[in-house]
């Protein structure tokens, strides 16, 4: 199973790239973590946010391979602790499909992305900066994998 993070935004600060790479490189070859960046729509004083969300959503969904499970990252989604995320990871593996996790831009995800999702995950009730979310996601998914693999990274 392959895990994809499909995220709005490019040209992240160096610390974000390094943090993400640190965790993504740790994944086993049979479960790689891939990051796909979608350029953010131009936002200005009089920007049409609904149109920007629509275009970003179309671009995100266009990168999802047919048959992939789509999971959105959204504040009203379901919150999982590490054990529950590990159970989700096991469930996704048994499903036999690759998983695409959609991370929206500053205004979130388009209605089309939300409608296409089989699951919605809330990372936190806090509002987090989108660059930081990439690092937190990579670490959380790696930690969940370590639980499923009985790897010593995670300690109770």
Swiss-Prot record:
Signal peptide: none
Chief place of localization: cytoplasm
GO molecular function, one term: rRNA (pseudouridine-N3-)-methyltransferase activity
Entry's localization field: Cytoplasm
Keyword set includes Zinc: no
CDD domains reported in the protein's UniProt record: RlmH-like
Residue numbers binding S-adenosyl-L-methionine: 73, 104, 123-128
Catalytic activity as recorded in UniProt: pseudouridine(1915) in 23S rRNA + S-adenosyl-L-methionine = N(3)-methylpseudouridine(1915) in 23S rRNA + S-adenosyl-L-homocysteine + H(+)
Keywords in alphabetical order: Cytoplasm, Methyltransferase, rRNA processing, S-adenosyl-L-methionine, Transferase
Pfam families tied to this protein: SPOUT_MTase
Enzyme nomenclature, EC number: 2.1.1.177
Source domain of life: Bacteria
Cysteine disulfide links: none
Gene Ontology CC terms, in alphabetical order: cytoplasm
Described purpose of this protein according to its UniProt entry: Specifically methylates the pseudouridine at position 1915 (m3Psi1915) in 23S rRNA.
PANTHER family named among the record's database cross-references: METHYLTRANSFERASE (PTHR33603), RIBOSOMAL RNA LARGE SUBUNIT METHYLTRANSFERASE H (PTHR33603:SF1)
Family label: Belongs to the RNA methyltransferase RlmH family.
Subunit structure: Homodimer.
Protein's name in the database: Ribosomal RNA large subunit methyltransferase H
Species of the source: Photobacterium profundum (strain SS9)
């Amino acid at each position: 199973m392959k895990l994809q993070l499909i995220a709005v935004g490019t040209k992240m600060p160096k610390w974000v790239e390094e943090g993400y790479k640190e965790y993504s490189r740790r994944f086993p070859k049979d479960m790689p973590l891939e990051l796909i960046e979608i350029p953010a729509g131009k936002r200005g004083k009089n920007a049409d946010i609904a149109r920007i969300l629509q275009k970003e959503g179309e671009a995100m969904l266009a990168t999802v391979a047919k048959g992939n499970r789509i999971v959105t990252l959204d504040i009203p989604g379901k919150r999982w602790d590490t054990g529950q995320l590990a159970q989700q990871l096991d469930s996704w593996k048994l499903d036999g499909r690759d998983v695409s996790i959609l991370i929206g831009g500053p205004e979130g995800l388009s209605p089309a992305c939300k409608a296409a999702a089989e699951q919605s995950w809330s990372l936190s009730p806090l509002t987090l900066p989108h660059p930081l979310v990439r690092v937190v996601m990579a670490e959380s998914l790696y930690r969940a994998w370590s639980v499923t693999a009985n790897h010593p990274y995670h300690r109770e």
